[in-house]
């Protein structure tokens, strides 16, 4: 229909036909739905349509509303000055139209990863069990990137119902899911004789079962989006998932379980075009919440270190490159694995640890 309208009304100097798909769809009993390349433009289209309806209603209050004829409507739509303005607009970012969910969204790695995705045009749902903290992060991102592209949801990844609700919120707000960054986690350290069953279960509940619940809940949305391409899962693992760590058996083995889950999912889901990869960081202290928990006295204390600056120096000196590992470094790797730049990579692991010989590929 739109193509026929264009052919009837075009002039010799008319711009080429634009997207023939409808922008506004009116569904009786449901409402007005707008479709565009990004959430901001969709909202603006909805507002313009609403204002147009209000003008029509206002006109009907004093007489009959007379719509412009087809040719006049075409000349407005394909006005050459409007076309010149459109041609001068910057190219859309590589993540425009993509929808991501980031668990552990209030922490250092989660916020850095979300920021990296939104900077390239993605819409992001931040999920974190700390509702107040994740809402604060969301508010900051709304000011930075715009209120249309970010939402937050309270979610404990060990709670099956909360995980399901988080993905329902993602579908409701943005109509799908293209990228999952499974990042929610904890850190613990204790020798085996002091590792309680409760501590062991807590690590496996969050780091193994939590990743399983998150990935499983995402799958129905991924299945609906697979024809669009670019569907990607990124697990945030750990150097300790592949390198034995004395005094951290619960944490390290749970991380290893999550990494092997990623391998299994990569194998299972490749025929569906869903990619699954892992980023293994090490010693991310700056911007991390782990310094505020028991890990400070359990882990850092075993090295005789009780000041953050001393611990950062300890890990920096331990690395082969002698450099700090920051949340933004992990975010860069996660972004690459989520993007089309890695479209032919699945089942892989990237180490962002400033060089740790224990984790070298053997």
For the regions a protein language model found, what residue spans apply to each?
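Active-site helix of classical SDR
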Residues: 215, 254, 262
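Active-site loop immediately N-terminal to the catalytic Tyr-X3-Lys motif
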Residues: 193, 243-249, 271, 322, ...
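Alpha-helical segment proximal to the catalytic Tyr-Lys
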Residues: 220, 267-268, 343
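Short C-terminal tail/terminal secondary-structure segment
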Residues: 334, 346-362
């Amino acid at each position: 229909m739109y193509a026929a309208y264009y052919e009837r009304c075009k002039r010799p100097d008319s711009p080429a036909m634009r997207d023939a798909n409808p922008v506004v769809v009116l569904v009786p009993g449901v409402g007005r739905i707008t479709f565009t390349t990004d959430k901001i433009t969709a909202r603006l289209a909805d507002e313009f349509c609403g204002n147009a309806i209000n003008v029509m209603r206002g006109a009907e209050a004093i007489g009959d509303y007379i719509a412009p004829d087809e040719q006049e409507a075409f000349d407005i739509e394909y006005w050459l000055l409007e076309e010149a303005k459109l041609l001068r607009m910057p190219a859309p970012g590589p993540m425009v139209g993509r929808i991501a969910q980031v668990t552990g969204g209030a922490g250092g790695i989660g916020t850095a990863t979300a920021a990296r995705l939104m900077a390239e045009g993605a819409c992001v749902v931040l999920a974190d069990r700390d509702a107040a903290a994740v809402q604060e992060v969301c508010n900051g991102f709304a000011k930075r990137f715009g209120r249309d592209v970010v939402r937050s949801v309270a979610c404990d990844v060990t709670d099956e119902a909360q995980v399901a609700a988080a993905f329902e919120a993602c579908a409701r707000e943005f109509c799908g899911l293209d990228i999952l960054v499974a990042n929610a986690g904890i850190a613990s350290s204790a020798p085996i004789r002091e590792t309680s069953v409760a501590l062991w279960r807590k690590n496996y509940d969050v780091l193994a079962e939590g990743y399983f619940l998150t990935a499983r809940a995402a799958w129905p949305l991924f299945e609906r989006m697979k024809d669009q391409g670019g569907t990607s899962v990124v697990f945030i693992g750990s150097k300790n998932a592949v390198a034995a760590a004395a005094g951290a058996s619960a944490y390290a083995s749970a991380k290893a379980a999550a990494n092997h889950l990623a391998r299994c999912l990569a194998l299972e889901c490749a025929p569906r075009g869903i990619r699954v990869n892992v980023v293994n960081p090490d010693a991310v202290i700056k911007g991390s919440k782990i310094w505020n928990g028991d890990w400070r006295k359990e882990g850092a204390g075993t090295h005789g270190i009780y000041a953050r600056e001393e611990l950062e120096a300890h890990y920096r000196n331990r690395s082969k490159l002698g450099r700090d590992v920051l949340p933004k470094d992990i975010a860069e790797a996660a972004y690459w694995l989520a993007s089309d730049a890695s479209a032919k990579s699945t089942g892989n692991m990237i180490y962002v640890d400033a060089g740790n010989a224990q984790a070298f590929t053997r």
